[in-house]
Amino acid sequence: SSGPPQPGPMGPMGPRGPPGPPGSSGPQGFTGPPGEPGEPGASGAMGSRGPSGPPGKNGDDGEPGKPGRPGERGAAGPQGARGFSGLDGAKGDAGPAGPKGESGAPGENGVPGVMGARGLPGERGRPGPPGPSGARGNDGNTGPGGPPGPTGPAGPPGFPGGAGVKGETGPAGGRGNEGPQGARGEPGNPGPAGPAGPAGSPGTDGGPGAKGSPGAAGLAGAPGFPGARGPAGAQGAVGAPGPKGNNGDPGASGPKGEPGAKGEPGPAGVQGLSGPSGEEGKRGARGEPGGAGPRGPPGERGAPGARGFPGADGGAGGKGAPGERGATGESGSPGAPGAPGSKGVTGSPGSPGPDGKTGPAGVAGQDGRPGPPGSAGARGQPGVMGFPGPKGPAGESGKPGERGPAGATGPVGAPGKXGDVGAPGPSGVAGPAGEKTGKPGEQGAPGEAGPPGPSGPRGDRGFPGERGAPGLGGPTGARGEPGAAGAPGGLGAPGMQGMPGERGASGLPGAKGERGDAGGKGGDGAPGKDGARGXTGALGVPGPHGAQGEKGEGGAVGVAGPTGPRGAPGERGETGPPGPAGFAGPPGADGQPGAKGETGDSGPKGDAGAPGPGGPVGAAGPQGPAGPTGPKGARGGAGPPGATGFPGPAGRVGPSGPAGAAGPPGPVGPVGKDGARGETGAAGRPGEAGAAGAPGPSGEKGLVGLPGQRGERGFSGLPGPSGEPGKQGPSGPVGERGPPGPSGPPGLSGAPGEAGREGSQGHDGAPGRDGSAGPKGDRGESGMAGPPGPPGAPGAPGAVGPSGKSGDRGETGPAGPAGPSGPAGVRGGPAGAKGDRGEAGEAGDRGHKGHRGFTGMQGLPGPAGAHGERGPAGASGPAGPRGPAGSNGAAGKDGMNGLPGPLGPPGPRGRNGEMGPAGPPGPPGPAGPPGPPGSGFDFVSQPLQEEAPDPFRGGHYRSPDGTQKSPARALLLGGSNDVELRLPLLDLAPMDVGAPDQEFGVEVGPVCFL
């Protein structure tokens, strides 16, 4: 063939020749890409204060303020209309006693008298039946800690503990799963030469240019536009090798030479120093699981978990041995009054006198005999309550009249005045028990406010409230100090290319450029004639990154690299949204015991006991000392598992872990150094524009943007559904004591009892049976902590968590020192065939001890423990609360008349007064919440009963929800005097909608009255 002769196979590599003289400066390169942003500069000085901005828009109306303090007392209103008649006045003072009349027929029992002074002690009664359990006593002092119970089941998951202290470095773990594919690595050392590629098609000859004369080497200027290529000069004679020069500046890349024949593989070079750590690669696919490493040493003991929920009640223990006899209780309350004495002899009735006419009221005369009762007149209108008149003078006592003959039995006279107290009759037999207690009186007025009680126990943690509406913006604050320098901004777009500047001093090496798009392939030029071998050019500038090669098969595991330096802590993240609602915390500790309550009402009257033997009741003995704490009960079963706790706070950043195993080999490295420079070929025609390259890989994730401006306030949402009723709150303080009510009317007289015989003395009764077990006591205070139980078995290993998201790009680390240049490798050919996938490496050595783990989740409750054995008998407890009063003893002797009793309970409510005039309209209230969503209803409005001066607006709603649970949707009544009534009504009097002498009407639609 007429082509140029093919070169023979390449000979072995000769010894390294002496370095040639520095080459001439290469043509000026293109402008490099902009460097990566520099470190943030120091904060500038604080600028002068800017002019005031224009006033902002008016803000939204503020939330309604709290109610103001009560205003001062207003002026007196006009006199109201005449009220209704008042209650009957109090009974006037008693007049002087009249002469003693003849004994009348026994009257009906009078009103029960006030309680007399305490009589002499009665004879001792038989023991009463055991009283009901007393109220719970105050909590005793905390007893000494009991012996440690058995290890309980694991509690519910606690809240995550804080991060523990850094543990010691653990032994190396086994090989982990294959990590995801890393980012492109640094270029590797040149691979062995590939086989020769086919010869390219010859290009068209270019015109030879004229060679310029070499200039003196100046300082490296800023990159200018590329100049035109000069013509080739004549070849000079080869000079003697000069002394070794310093490394010259990198020359421009020469044209691509023809591929040589495939050489023999050279010997492996010496391993270079470790290069600087590359950027963090993207996460590769998940590798196959490695072999299990040896079991590490147990970790440090975890922080104690949160307090578990109380376990289920354990089974009841066996009955304990009977305790010692308790201390003597307080003396019982005095017994009820005895049975009435025997009936006196009936006196002869007096003859009835005639009815006298009502004369003018004179001085009080002598008492006449009682006349027969007149017929009841019609009830008169109640008169106006007059002022009480002055007290009249007492009349003289009349002389006793003569005793008249006994007449026929007249009608029963009015009851006579009480006679003198007779001598005590003999004691009668105990009468039968009276009927059950009377109805309870009406509720008294509230008492005065007692002193505030001690704090109650801490309530359960409430559910978090709904998120409140955003508040109004506050006024602009004063200008703050300049903040620290912000994070570096994102990369700006490159500016237009400037004109070439003057040649500057040699710059520092630039940072690594971004990867360029792959250009289209130009046509191959025609091979030039072999020129004489030129001097070795200076090292070329590193070429741009080649396109990313296909993913190679996983290489063998590399040697672990050194541990990188600890990264700087990240800036504090923005506050996250509120977490989900937590579960109710454990119940708080019991509060201090409350103050002693007021004495309760007396119980119902007990049955009369047989009279016991006499003897005064001894005083109450002193209260015995509190016995020691009883044995600890059996542990209850575990409670249900608690719901998952809140997520714990993020732990602090841990120290860098040991370096991972080496990743798979990176893609094919860039083209190796050029071979000997050939003669300059003729310039080729410009190639046609290549097709557009494939889109480049996604750029790095940008920094988080600043928060947007605050949006305008939205409208209030619809009201949510009613929440579940909250737990009952603690009792409010006792109300202040109300004023005493008016005197009630006297009760009806009781029928006289029959006289009983005196009973004989009874014997002591046998002791009663043991009472049934009392109700379960309230939960005691927590005992002191027992000694720690043995450690539980280690929990099962958790499942492997999902892969985390790729972290943000770390800042560039400092460049490591440059390693020495390796010898130039033989120029490689095209990539060889894909190698087989390597086998999994052997398991690594045992890793160091790992850091302390977080507290584990709370385990499920264990099964209930077995019942404990019956404990020994407890010591005698303190004296129990005072029991109820025993049965009544025999009647004591009549006591003296007692002091007058306290004021009776308030009487029934009087009639309502007439409605006063309407007051002035109140100030407008705060805006109510938005109404419920409308539902279909029809509304009819029509005036009612026009003759009423207060016409009543009526309407009926057809609403299925108008019930006691949702009164807001029921019938609403409103009068023109601004009185609104809301149905369901529980109490509606005619006075609420008009005066007593006015008519009123209400038209009510289909609503539910309860």
Swiss-Prot record:
Segments forming domain Fibrillar collagen NC1: 982-1010
Protein keywords: Collagen, Extracellular matrix, Secreted
Superkingdom of the source species: Eukaryota
InterPro entries referenced in this protein's UniProt entry, alphabetically: Collagen, Collagen_superfamily, Fib_collagen_C
Localization, UniProt: Secreted, Extracellular space, Extracellular matrix
UniProt-annotated stretches for the region Disordered: 1-969
Gene Ontology CC, one term: extracellular matrix
Disulfide bond entries: none
Biased amino acid composition, Gly residues: 160-179, 203-212, 311-323, 468-477, 486-495, 519-528, 609-618, 633-642
Molecular-function GO term, any one: extracellular matrix structural constituent conferring tensile strength
Extent of Basic and acidic residues compositional bias: 58-72, 834-847
GO biological process, one term: skeletal system development
Bias (Low complexity): 25-48, 73-82, 213-268, 300-310, 324-343, 405-448, 559-568, 581-596, 643-662, 679-701, 796-805, 872-900
Bias kind Pro residues: ranges: 1-24, 145-159, 918-933
Family: Belongs to the fibrillar collagen family.
UniProt-listed PANTHER family: COLLAGEN ALPHA, COLLAGEN ALPHA-1(I) CHAIN
Protein name: Collagen, type I, alpha 1b
The organism of origin for this protein: Epinephelus marginatus
